[in-house]
């Protein structure tokens, strides 16, 4: 029987096994390959598994071990999925497709389920194309995105936002890391904003993708007006997508202000769901049960 797993640290509370087992009715094996030693985890994969998911802090290291790459994975320079193929180790990045689907679903509720039913394994491609086609109709001018955090997930978020047609700014506690992404991907014309400009940058943009594992101090002082933006009556409401679903930075009073401003907050659980749906198909070659996965993530 085919065998799959997850490497990273820490992963003991990961929801990936729950989603995988729901997607395939427990018919395929999925393990947590726990440990903070990348080389040991990688050896376990090579010795025992057909494919693995990869989470922090191993995404860049796994990318460098691969021999084949999907186009967007190569651009992103980090992988959350490695699968053995007859031609070698293939790296993919379903964070990218998960972000595409999460953003599209926020603006067009129901689109992902509809397109999954219609297009199957090509659903995320069709979602991507649909959003690009509709962008000019829903935004009065070219929309802006702010990516906070420039690790593996942040890099995937930056490429996804730019591919969806957003003018995209990068922000990281270490500005050099953000600048490195901008320099390596000049085709996207990324700009780099300092963390000290977080409030102003958030206020100006239509989309925020927050990938830092911890909360910036400035979040607690954000007002309803900051979340609403400079011209809240023009175009759709601001969307805030956060990667961290375990201890989200936008919670409590910040969430109250997000709701009061009419913004749409997208939990990292939704990102996790959509990256799993698209990633598991690549991992196993079998279409997972999207409905069962969605129900499973709502129950936990």
Segments from the language model and where they lie:
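Short acidic low-complexity segments
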Residues: 39-42, 187-205
